[in-house]
């Protein structure tokens, strides 16, 4: 179930994939390995916040002399960083664990599933040599040393309190030009459907100075897009400074030489005039707002324990569009919440049609044990929830096609990320697309020979659009000048 502070979803929905190490990170880690240590592979499942935890574990193990392989077949030990956010995510995590167990691998279970089930996991899976909680991954080297000594290890703090900083080793698994930066951990909100606070603990923010220091490290590595993440990014700093400090953080990051800064997981009430002013005034902060709204109807929002959102949605969106006319808006919704009536769903459908978001993800309600919503009466039948999801997605697809189509003819900066070696076609993203959850831009060489390569940021004229993606061609200086003169 997508909490406002949980995973984002995309118009073209997908589960976050298990990654393999990219070649530049893999090579860097291989150079640190020694033959005295076993080789370790990672299977990563879950959101980008989980990804950052995995990257820290990779960095710690490489620093300690472990060989880290992108191929599970080459490894004696596989660390599985699991997700337990919704039932489908748990099922995928368990399938991965069972598959690896059947291959005879020694398994270390990390992440949200370990935090959720703890000792029960060790009892259920004899091949599991250790479990590591969401607040304990910084001890991964010590855990593996205990496993090497023949121990079975339970390293799960009952209440997670750890938050990493710029001094904890890290090897990124994203492309060289893109990095996630976790500004806080945990969540103080208690949405009725969400288990994340139980898995991640209460909010704990990093100091602004720590975040800026890590951003500078990433800039030195060639990062061109920095994505700020936490459970509720607009609440950043509340626990540390006594009030939210996102606007101050954005202004500080504006001094770092990274072309794009993107913010994920913004709560509606946190988009204050000060925050919107920072979006508007800091040149490298993208006008991209990720707002997990979850529903529009006041009664459903009250049942979700989000009563503060009533009356905010429409007013907020109007204010955003007034202050940020080029804003790109993405959101997620839950359909089939217990007690959701047809009238309440129609309210949501009309809201989506009226607000015309750029990107929308829709999830059917999934009851999570240990949350208040799991005990609510008047469950909506699964087939009804699926039908509502289909109707909402169908309505949004037409809107997405229209919103993408409005970009045809524009010249925009595109961060090139991939190249098809056989066709030469390049794949990248402009500011309206976040990695993994939104669409992409398919790029051709320009008519005057202007070209690009992976890892660069180039001007592209958008020539075509569909529901999900854009197409375009690289333009040269003369074409950019001509475009300005004729605008």
Curated annotation (Swiss-Prot):
One of its GO terms (cellular component) is cytosol. InterPro entries: Elp3/MiaA/NifB-like_rSAM (IPR006638), Methylthiotransferase (IPR005839), Methylthiotransferase_CS (IPR020612), Methylthiotransferase_N (IPR013848), Methylthiotransferase_N_sf (IPR038135), NA-bd_OB-fold (IPR012340), Ribosomal_uS12_MeSTrfase_RimO (IPR005840), rSAM (IPR007197). [4Fe-4S] cluster 2 binds at residues 187, 191, 194. Residues 173-402 form the Radical SAM core domain. CDD domains: Radical_SAM. The keyword Zinc-finger does not apply. [4Fe-4S] cluster 1 binds at residues 47, 83, 112. This is Ribosomal protein uS12 methylthiotransferase RimO. It comes from Synechococcus sp. (strain RCC307). The gene is rimO.
